[in-house]
């Protein structure tokens, strides 16, 4: 029996929730940038839509077809696929973001490798997550467990350890943490 898709059930509501952290994302992702952005676990496209004007092209990848059906197709390109096996070539994107989704994936390490793989050298990857070090987020984590959402929250330092390479930094405020990874440009021999 397939698992219940919590996200398809809430997609129509979620699509109406605006993204309030555009300015922080602009800062940590070094936007605007020429090129393509991939929003992994992007659901209805609410985050990608909020920053769409800062990139040439925005693609959202999500496993929930119900969420993707709510995405504004005129501005975003939806792709049904999981973070553990992204259907893109190596180095396809100048920016890769994952907002409020890492705690929902099954294999954090594999998802991190995949996101880093599709990031171009010199590109920036941003993972925005509720900061499990805060009391309010601990309550959210408990609620998601009770709702059988299989969530597993990681602290920012644990997220950084998923990435073996790249320049890493963390910004945290108001119960949210942004883990930023910049992929190094390999010098040509």
Model-predicted segments: where are they?
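A conserved beta-strand element that flanks and buttresses the S-adenosyl-L-methionine
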Residues: 97
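Class I SAM-dependent methyltransferase SAM/SAH-binding core
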Residues: 38-85
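Short catalytic micro-motifs in class I SAM-dependent methyltransferases
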Residues: 100-101
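Conserved class I S-adenosyl-L-methionine
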Residues: 1-32, 46-47, 67, 140-143
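C-terminal lobe and adjacent flexible extensions of AdoMet/dcAdoMet transferase-like proteins
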Residues: 180-189
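C-terminal alpha-helical "lid/dimerization" subdomain adjacent to the S-adenosyl-L-methionine
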Residues: 11-18, 47, 126-179
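A short glycine-rich, Lys/Arg-flanked "PGG" loop and its adjoining helix->strand segment in the class I
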Residues: 109-121
């Amino acid at each position: 029996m397939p698992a219940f898709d919590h996200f398809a059930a809430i997609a129509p509501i979620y699509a109406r929730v605006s993204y309030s952290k555009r300015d922080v994302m602009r800062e940590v992702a070094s936007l605007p940038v020429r090129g393509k952005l991939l929003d992994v676990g992007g659901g209805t496209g609410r985050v990608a839509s909020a920053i769409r004007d800062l990139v040439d092209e925005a693609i959202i990848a999500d496993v929930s077809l119900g969420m993707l059906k709510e995405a504004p197709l005129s501005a975003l390109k939806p792709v049904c696929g999981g973070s553990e096996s992204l259907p893109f070539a190596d180095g396809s994107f100048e920016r890769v973001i994952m907002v409020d989704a890492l705690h929902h994936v099954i294999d954090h390490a594999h998802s991190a490798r995949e996101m880093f793989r599709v990031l171009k050298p010199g590109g920036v990857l941003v993972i925005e997550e509720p900061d499990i070090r805060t009391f309010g987020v601990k309550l959210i984590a408990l609620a998601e467990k009770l709702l059988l959402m299989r969530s597993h929250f990681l602290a920012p330092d644990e997220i950084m350890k998923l990435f073996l390479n790249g320049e890493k930094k963390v910004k945290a405020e108001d119960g949210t943490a942004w883990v930023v990874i910049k992929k190094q440009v390999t010098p040509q021999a």
